[in-house]
Amino acid sequence: DYAHLCKTAQGITTEVTATPRTSCERYTFPAGEGHIILNLGQGLTNESGAMVRRVSSTEVEGMKLLGTFCYTTQAVFPIYFVMRVSREPSTAGPWKFQPKLQGVESAWSPDDGTYKLYENYHREIAGDDIGYRFSYDDLGEGEQVTVHMGVSFVSIENARMNLEAEQQGKTFDQLRAEATAQWNRDLGRIRIEGGTPDQQTIFYTALYHALIHPSIISDVNGEYPKMESGDTGKADYTRYSVFSLWDTYRNLHPLLTLVYPERQTDMLRTLVGMYEDWGWLPRWELFGRETYTMEGDP
C-alpha cells in the first residue's frame, strides 16, 4: 500500500508504504532542523508499557505492550520492533515523560511534568510513556530521511528477520512499486463493467477494505504466538489474526473462498490451529487473544 500525506504545518512531506510485516516511511524536510520521533507512549488499549534500546547510531529495537479493545478482558501481549533511519543523526536518544510531582519535590526537578530528553544515555529505557528521537541540525532544502521498521509478535530477532527478508536493502521507491503491483494483482482478480467512474471507485475501495483483515501474524520463519498462551508456535502455512467472525462469516469469508481461495484456506487452517492451541474455536480473536466482545457464536 502507499499513502502520500500532505505537508505538515512545518513543511514536512510524509510518504508511507509497507510489506506484509514491515513498513517504510520517507520524510522530506525543509532546510534546517528536523526530528524523527518514535512514540511508545500511551495507546488506545487497556495496557501500557514499553522498552527501547539503542543498537547503533541509526538503529533501535524494542517492544510495546498491547491490550485488547473495548476493555472486555485484561489480556496483554507484546509487539516487537526494529527501526532504522537512513541518515546519521546529529544527536539521538530516548525520551520519557516525567509525571507531575507533588510538594517540594516538584521544585527539585527541572523536568517536572514535561518530557525529559536523555542526551548521553545509550542503554535500554523502559516505562509507560517513553520513546526515541533522531535529531538533525543541518538538513538541506528537500533533504529526505527514510525510516525502515520491522515488527513481530514473537521476538525482536524475528522483527529484524522480517525486515531483512522483506526489504532486503530496497529503496522507498522500490518498495512502493512492489506494494502498488501487489495491490493491483489483488484488486485485479475482479473485473467490473458498467457503472460510473465513482461507482467503480466505490467498488474497488470496498474490495480494498475487505482485504485488510484478517491480517498476517506469523513471521517469515513461520513462528507465531499461540492462542491465549502466547507461547511460540511454528506453522508451515501463513497464520492470520483479527477474526471478527460475527461480522465476517456471512459475506467476507464467502468472498475470500471464491476470489482468494489460497488465503481462505490458510485462514481456516489458522482457526483449526487456534482450537488445537486453546481447546476452543475463537469468537472474536485479536492477535492471539479472545476478546469475548460479541454475543453468540459465529
Question: What is the meaning of each model-derived region?
Answer:
Residues 241-298:
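Aromatic-rich carbohydrate-recognition surfaces in CAZymes
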Residues 1-240, 273:
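Beta-sandwich/jelly-roll carbohydrate-recognition scaffolds of carbohydrate-active enzymes
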